Amino acid sequence: MLPTIGGEHASRILFLIIEFFDVAEEGENKNVRGLSYIAENSNDTIAVGTTDSIAIPLNTNRNTTKYQFIRNTNNPNIRNADTIEFIYEVNEVYVNRACGFKAVYKDLSAIRSIETPASNNWIRSVSIEKLNVENEQNTHVNIDH
């Protein structure tokens, strides 16, 4: 494979790294069965499968991205969708002459939509682990379920 001009940052969007945890066992990763997600105003559902972490893109043209996270996607009897809106500032950071600039996200926050009754939500809490999304080596958001 040929190297890319600009190295690892060329033609690349930084992804938000999310880990899923067991709400009953603090600090214990917990798989989400049949996970998929869809961005607001999109018709493309991304099927992930069973996992305890995902990487999702944030919109660089706006300061907010809203996703619907769906568990048990393939079972209509127990399918459950929750919505989280991520809010941030988009800043451009100079990488080098070959690559130019890349987008980083600052002051990340999240708003979880609460259903009525709240027990209908499969996502119990969302916590921001890194306020700034500058790389993909660290988890940025924890979701307890």
Predicted segments with their positions:
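Extracytoplasmic cysteine-anchoring/structural motifs
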Residues: 1-10, 57-145
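Long, hydrophobic N-terminal alpha-helical segment
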Residues: 1-55
